[in-house]
Amino acid sequence: MADLWYAAYGSNLARDRFTTYLSGGRPVGAARHYPGARDPRPPSDDRPLLLPGRIYFAGRSLTWGGGMAFYDPDAPGTVYARAYRLSAEQFSDLAAQEMRRDPGTDLDLAPVLAGRRHSYGPGRYETLHLVGELEQHPVLTFTAPVDHGLAPNPPGPGYLATIARGLRECHRLSDDTVVAYLDAARAVSGS
């Protein structure tokens, strides 16, 4: 497979934050430095995307402090996402960094492409979902497994601000719409 689309729904909605997974570096407000991808070029395309489901915040981010955004594709609602067109290699390196692994190994995407959902491990962001298709290429995202056991937790201010910036940047949402959307996600999270 040459290309695919990655659907971002958390801080990766903000393009400059997302591209640190490719080029390497430390996003503004984050505590973690990312090694980057084998192919550091920016995405060949990106666009707004709507997904069925909802986001919620849980666990504790070592990068941002506070809860992390997770995607529940089975919940009612609509998720504002951003689709980035990447090579399969770039996606593998992105996923590795999200899974707190070293980049450099290609993921076997056949299981998720065949079954629409596949867990590559027990941790957060190790469950991949095939959420659709764009221009005859698969759209993939990752989240925690359904039974992850992470406690609901409000997001840290830097993380929340990065998500809000990405929502405005990609979807051109008003501040009021961004606040209402993130408040709804925090309410689901019990925060």
Where are these regions (language model features)?
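Glycine-aromatic micro-motifs
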Residues: 1-191
